[in-house]
Amino acid sequence: MSSDDRPVPAEPSPGPRSGSPGRHAHAGADQGGAIDWEVLAPFLERGAEIQTPLYEQAAAWLRALLSPDAAEGGAGGAPEAAAPGAASRAPTVRRILDVGSGPGVVSCLLARAFPDAEVCAVDATEALLVRARARADRLGLADRIHTHHAEVPHGLDSLGGADLIWSSKALHHVGDQRGAVAALAGHLRPGGLLAVCEGGLAPRFLPRDIGVGRPGLQARLDAAAEDWFAEMRAALPDATDTLEDWPAFLANAGLRTPRTRSFLLDLPAPLADDVRRYIQANLSRAVEEYGDQLDPGDLSTLTRLVDPHDPAGITRRPDAFLLSVQTVHTARAQEQ
């Protein structure tokens, strides 16, 4: 996994494990603590909702890639243009797997982006799948969205094939990431597309100098989160020390036409109150997760940032923003 997945405030990725700050919440699962899903699940769902503009960009790109008129192109991020109008035409996608779906926000988005497709939301946490089913029902998508309770990559054998497989911030929870990519690739139908959302950039939500404590707080949070993430990865069963090259993982799985693109979420100041509260919750979780790795000055600054009554707190200061980048790597199965 790359640096964007550090447990710092931003967008959670409700994958197979949940409990830590930032994009994740896997402290309970990875460290043996009990997880209160009544508290955590709405937090994960709201985080994914905040990221919806970014996911919509990614879904439009996937539609263009899957269009019969899509141009063959390189992997290096140059625009791979489809024929005029291709992105607006729904390609022939009949079945989608959302692996590590969490509460189903992206599952529902994919169902709307591909209106002829059945979507199977796959997650290891039944409480999150309950929310996914409820969300699909609220949006009138219950007839097209189904759920499957399974760990990744184990437990996927009964899933069957798919034209599109999406997995966001789930595979880095697997010790053998290369093997996990290969396992997912094995479920692609001929010509199907595997899209892995891993990487990007660490989010930003405050200026370098916030007028409290030592400037550069977020850079130091990044460093602490990197250490936390490395420890999490090292503790996974069957963890392998390998170069995290997602396009190479896709190629090693026998897939072709690798492409990579990054998508931006830019919520400028002043932030809406619910986004402020979401960042506040993430900061609180960061304190719990690796506050002991911070010096007393930074810990004091974080304490002020999460205080709803402090004028310097994240819920009250006018300069808070949210800037985030997610990277999606794709490749296709061979046509028969």
List PLM regions with ranges.
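Conserved alpha-helix/loop element of class I SAM-dependent methyltransferases that forms part
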Residues: I50-T92
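Conserved Class I S-adenosyl-L-methionine
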Residues: E244, R256-Q336
